[in-house]
Regions:
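Accessory RNA 3′-end/elbow-binding domains used by RNA modification enzymes
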Residues: 1-50, 110, 176, 195-304
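The conserved catalytic core of RNA pseudouridine synthases
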Residues: 31, 37, 55-59, 149-197
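Glycine/acidic-rich beta-strand-loop module
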Residues: 43-73, 142
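Pseudouridine synthase
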Residues: 132, 139, 144, 172-214
Length: 304
């Protein structure tokens, strides 16, 4: 991998190529860590699945950063998608089996914009049967691939922005969108096709950014540490004594907070993130306010 920094504990930005699973990037990282430090097991996970037919930014969480995974879903995710009109597939993408075909010849840009407008904001969305959502403790896609019937309950999701970038009607359109984690672009294409009466599925999907972090491009990796981690959260500098108090499960004064290093887009839902606690330039704790003081929500030993 070109220009790749060492896989130190922290968040690493990588480009997931077409055709690979998200977990293949995790396996590659684990192999690299094992080669660098034989016999020493370092936890690795990713910060949100990209399907094999999709490409773009994938977050690799290494070491203590794996504990931050749940804090990454509530920030903006940016996508560019190609929607194919006229056929719906059972997976919602070009890899699936066609389950419905319709005539898209009457589609117009105005009709597409009117259909898209109804999906902005909060909504209940049924995930694809081939999603990574758990059903009975098992990812739904495994059941679907075995031929089992998969009926997933709707999830509450949020679409912040969506606009059509271009059209090649009646065949396809290109869509750009910003959403919260948990939103399925495949499901959006499926529902648009049903509303418009012709069927639709995704041919391409590119995740271009998550929060302030952009896709580094093929073959590149970028490591995030210190104030680059969770930059949408406020910051509190901690003294040696305060770190000791927090580790003993004692409260510390609220003190002086520094503002986030990155601001969410106007109107985007507040992720209600904990305050970052820094000591000697490293992120060592996540703090929660309780009864007029800060307490330890999560300790990040060694720091990030």
């Amino acid at each position: 991998m070109r220009d790749a920094p060492p896989l130190a504990p922290g968040i690493h930005l990588v480009h997931k190529p077409l055709g690979e699973t998200s977990f293949s990037s995790v396996r590659a990282a684990m192999a690299e860590l094992e080669a660098a430090r034989p016999g020493k097991r370092v936890p690795v996970c990713h910060g949100g699945t990209l399907d094999p037919f999709a490409e773009g930014l994938l977050l690799l969480l290494v070491g203590q950063a794996t504990r931050l995974m749940d804090l990454l879903h509530a920030v903006p995710k940016h996508y560019v998608a190609q929607v194919i009109w006229g056929t719906e597939t059972d997976t919602g993408d070009l890899l699936g089996r066609v389950v419905h075909a319709g005539d898209p010849s009457a589609l117009t840009p105005g009709a597409l914009e009117a259909a898209l407008a109804g999906f902005r904001g909060w909504q209940d969305q049924v995930p694809p049967a081939t999603s990574a959502k758990k059903l009975g403790g098992e990812p739904a896609y495994r059941k679907a691939h075995r031929g089992e019937e998969v009926v997933l309950p709707p999830s509450r999701v949020y679409l912040h922005e969506a606009r059509w970038r271009s059209h090649e009607l009646p065949r396809s359109s290109q869509l750009e969108l910003v959403c919260r984690g948990g939103f399925y672009v495949r499901s959006l294409a499926r529902e648009l096709g049903r509303i418009l009466g012709c069927g639709a599925h995704l041919a391409r999907l590119h995740r271009t950014a998550i929060g302030p972090w952009e896709d580094p491009g093929p073959g590149r990796r970028m490591g995030l540490h210190g104030r680059q981690v969770l930059p949408w959260s406020a910051l509190r500098e901690l003294s040696d004594a305060e770190v000791g108090e927090l580790r003993r499960e004692r409260p510390i004064a609220l003190g002086r907070l520094l503002p986030p290093d990155w601001r969410l887009p106007p109107g985007f839902p507040d992720p209600e993130a904990p305050v970052r606690g820094f000591h000697l330039g490293r992120l060592v704790a996540l703090l929660r306010e309780q009864e007029g003081a800060f307490r330890m929500q999560m300790e990040l030993r060694g720091g990030l």
